[in-house]
Amino acid sequence: MTKKIVTLSGDGIGPEIMAAGLGVLDKVASKIEFDYDVDAKPFGGAGIDAEGHPLPKATLEAAKSADAILLAAIGGPKYDNAPVRPEQGLLAIRKELNLFANIRPVRIFDALKHLSPLKPERIEGVDFVVVRELTGGIYFGEHILEEDKARDINDYSADEIRRIMRRAFKIAQGRGKKVTSIDKQNVLATSKLWRKVADEVSLEFPDVTLEHQLVDSAAMITNPARFDVVVTENLFGDILSDESSVLPGTLGVMPSASHSENGPSLYEPIHGSAPDIAGQGIANPISMILSVAMMLRESFNETEGAELIENAVDKTLNQGILTRDLGGQASTAEMTAAIISNL
């Protein structure tokens, strides 16, 4: 059955890295007999330029009917003071598709260990996933600003916590069978509920070990290798996922996914649109290419295709083929061609 993939190239280097990702997908699809159609739609700044809105109606309708969505990058300085900004499109599509779970793998590539700000012995064996709840918590509560005081309401329901916990435990079942739930249970009421629900969900997954960890002693920098799957609420997840992105020493090799309960998932690099290098052909496409691998595995259960891509990226880096952000001289096209060759 042919799968429908909606692509949102967006802004800056987005079109360049999207082309790289689709080039790799085309090659690997022929190897694993994966049939798909691509429906390219404007989004972000490109949506504003084309339709006056970062999430045009036709783009949203296509996304809702897709089997998966690939997003490259959005934003740029031309929109900094605009009344409508590209980032509003990302918030809107998350809401419209009910993307409640953000998944961010953190892995250290052997060929890039020297880029990490941590000592080699600290990053040895680092391979974990941060699972962040996206639709609840303090970001979506009431925000009240008065003249000399302010308050932000942090709300979570047991159902919101339960579904993100189940997602984390299911991911752990396919990995190291360990979940670390991060909260602030010694202070926050929401964290007390978070921990209670986590304990309840853990009973559904007897093959997975659950540990609780307070957010202020998570030790993600001092002992990152201890983690397998980390699950946490929106605010803590925002901070910890960004903190974890420091470990590899570059944003250029980190993919991510955002999942709904029943609809399509969205896959994207964690880096920005890099408008300063857009159009120069020097952008690093690896995050986008690894996002394609995540899509194959998580939306289509095409584990073989995902592993082919990941192994090809590993091999390419080990051959010393590096883009400028990684300390080399390879262009976007050269890096992409090398990865395709190594498939």
For each predicted feature, which ranges?
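Glycine-rich phosphate/pyrophosphate-binding loop and the adjoining helix
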Residues: T135-S181, Q185-V187, F205, E304, ...
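Glycine-rich phosphate/diphosphate-binding loop of Rossmann-like nucleotide-binding domains
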Residues: V6-G23, V28-A29, E147-A218, R226
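Buried hydrophobic packing segments
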Residues: G21, L25, A198, M288-S299, ...
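Buried hydrophobic positions in well-ordered alpha/beta secondary-structure cores of metabolic enzymes
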Residues: D11-G14, D67, V131, A168, ...
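N-terminal beta-loop-helix "entrance" segment that forms/cooperates
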Residues: E33-K57
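Glycine-rich phosphate/nucleotide-binding loop
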Residues: G45-I48, R107, H114, I221-I321
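N-terminal glycine-rich phosphate/adenylate-binding segment common to multiple enzyme folds
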Residues: D49-N154, L235
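Short coil/turn connectors at secondary-structure junctions
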Residues: M1-K4, F34, K64-A68, N98-L99, ...
